[in-house]
């Protein structure tokens, strides 16, 4: 099981963005020093009340700080973009990371974003599938000609190419059955959102693997899930530390139309988070977080992308969580996962 950190790129609009990005650099340096496998980020646009750092430029800046770690996108909203540009930028990220880049893409779900880019939401599936095909070909072929529904290419070659051979992994995100089956067929891996419970992930992972097998494809090494992780000396401290920020994050998800979330507004904040986290997040002491991550692994997750900071959270608390994860959880998860394989 690989263990990475999903970087928070969303910050309150009142915060100084330069300070918040300097804090991100500090986090990445600590993440690298503790031996994590990867760093990840996501993409959104038009986020009222928040800064949201642009994904690909952010990873380009962080590549040098992350030397030796993998970089991943979770995820690029591919229907909003020209796939040729994404192929070029992603290839360059592979070059500057030393061949340690994974391209994660997905449909998107916010109507505001599609309206801003003047892309009809009804076209998002066809744009995604066509875009993945174009990127794959541009990474592995010269003189690509493609005449599809959305994109017309005549004799296109990109340089530089990725340095991974045959190419970087392409992962597709979804939380619905049709999208998971699509990810199994057209991509190398599946990006899992943090919403489903562990039991739901286990069932979805089996369906994903069965779809790949029926298509004559090998098992995937890239089932990557965002997991909300709050590691503290004890569960009560974890709940108190994270509740104001995680609950605001999930309230934003609700406002943006993310399905699958319910929050009991009548409960106290810590109890709201306890209910939301049950069988879904990894929250509590190092031992509790270790057990929760291993439960995700047993459910089929091969790469945990752990989100440890949320909008408005103090840097000292983010760093403390990363430090505790790296010192106490990382080695124990790796040891027990290796034992389970033996």
Where are these regions (language model features)?
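An alpha-helical appendage that flanks or caps ligand/catalytic pockets
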Residues: 4, 33, 122-158, 197-302, ...
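N-terminal beta1-alpha1-beta2 module of alpha/beta enzyme domains
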Residues: 1-71, 166-168
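Flexible, glycine-rich active-site loops centered on histidine and acidic residues
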Residues: 2-19, 79-150, 190-202, 241, ...
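Glycine-rich, proline-tolerant flexible connector loops at the mouths of alpha/beta enzymes
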Residues: 38-62, 77, 194-198, 307-319
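Alpha-helix-loop-beta-strand connector modules within alpha/beta enzyme cores
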Residues: 52-73, 127-131, 322-339
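Conserved, mostly hydrophobic/aromatic
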Residues: 31, 35, 43, 62, ...
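Hydrophobic faces of well-ordered beta-strands that scaffold small-molecule active sites
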Residues: 3-7, 39-41, 71-73, 101-105, ...
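Acidic (Asp/Glu)-rich catalytic clusters
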Residues: 32-33, 59-68, 90-101, 184-185, ...
């Amino acid at each position: 099981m690989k263990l990475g950190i999903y970087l928070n790129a969303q910050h309150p609009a009142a915060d100084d963005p330069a300070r918040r990005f300097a804090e991100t650099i500090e986090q990445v340096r600590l993440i690298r020093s503790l031996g994590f496998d990867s760093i990840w980020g996501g993409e959104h646009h038009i986020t009222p009340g928040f800064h949201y750092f642009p994904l690909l430029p952010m990873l380009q800046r962080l590549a040098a700080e992350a030397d030796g770690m993998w970089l991943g996108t979770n995820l690029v909203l591919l229907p909003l973009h020209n796939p040729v540009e994404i192929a070029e930028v992603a290839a360059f990220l592979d070059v500057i990371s030393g061949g340690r880049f994974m391209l994660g893409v997905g449909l998107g779900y916010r109507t505001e974003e599609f309206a801003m880019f003047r892309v009809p939401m009804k076209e998002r599936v066809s744009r995604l599938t066509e875009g993945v095909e174009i990127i794959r070909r541009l990474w592995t072929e010269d003189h690509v000609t493609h005449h599809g529904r959305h994109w017309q290419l005549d004799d296109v070659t990109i340089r530089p190419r990725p340095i991974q051979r045959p190419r970087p992994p392409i992962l597709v995100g979804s939380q619905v059955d049709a999208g998971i089956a699509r990810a199994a067929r057209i991509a190398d891996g599946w990006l899992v959102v943090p919403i489903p419970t562990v039991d739901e992930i286990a069932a979805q992972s089996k369906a994903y693997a069965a779809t790949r097998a029926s298509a004559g494809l090998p098992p995937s090494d890239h089932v990557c899930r965002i997991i909300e992780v709050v590691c503290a000396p004890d569960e009560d401290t974890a709940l108190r530390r994270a509740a104001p920020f995680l609950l605001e994050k999930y309230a934003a998800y609700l406002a943006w139309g993310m399905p699958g979330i319910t929050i009991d507004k009548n409960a106290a904040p810590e109890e709201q988070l306890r209910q939301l986290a049950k069988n879904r997040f990894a929250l509590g002491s190092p031992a509790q977080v270790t057990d929760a991550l291993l439960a995700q692994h047993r459910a089929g997750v091969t790469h945990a992308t752990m989100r440890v900071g949320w909008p408005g959270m103090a840097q000292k608390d983010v760093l403390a969580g990363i430090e505790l994860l790296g010192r106490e959880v990382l080695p124990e998860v790796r040891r027990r996962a290796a034992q389970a394989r033996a």
